[in-house]
Amino acid sequence: MNNSKNFNLFLMDGEVTGRIKCTLSNWTGIAYKIPRTYLDKCKDRLDLKQSGVYFLFGKNDDGDDEVYIGQAGIRKNGEGVLFRVSEHLKDEIYFSDAVMLTTQKTHLGQQKFLI
């Protein structure tokens, strides 16, 4: 298996319904799955102050699944992807979970796209 990969899933709250951090060996990227109600517990995570892309998962008025996809850069106030996702708490768009893709270090800088 020359193309095999090893994912590391860290249950940040010790439960699968809580926050999950996902890393992949030999990749500088990092993914977080964070329930809406846990967003405020992530304010001290420096990697979530980086630029990144995010997915907001929820249901529409008909009960159908939907996803909103967005991107965030590093702002002048030093905030990044988590701050942008938190801004959606004021929107009419309801979401139950957020998935954020960013970097473990400042490898992304102000880039517009993740590859």
Where are the regions a protein language model picked out?
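GIY-YIG nuclease catalytic motif and its immediate N-terminal context
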Residues: M1-G80
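Conserved short loop/helix modules at catalytic or binding sites
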Residues: G73-I115
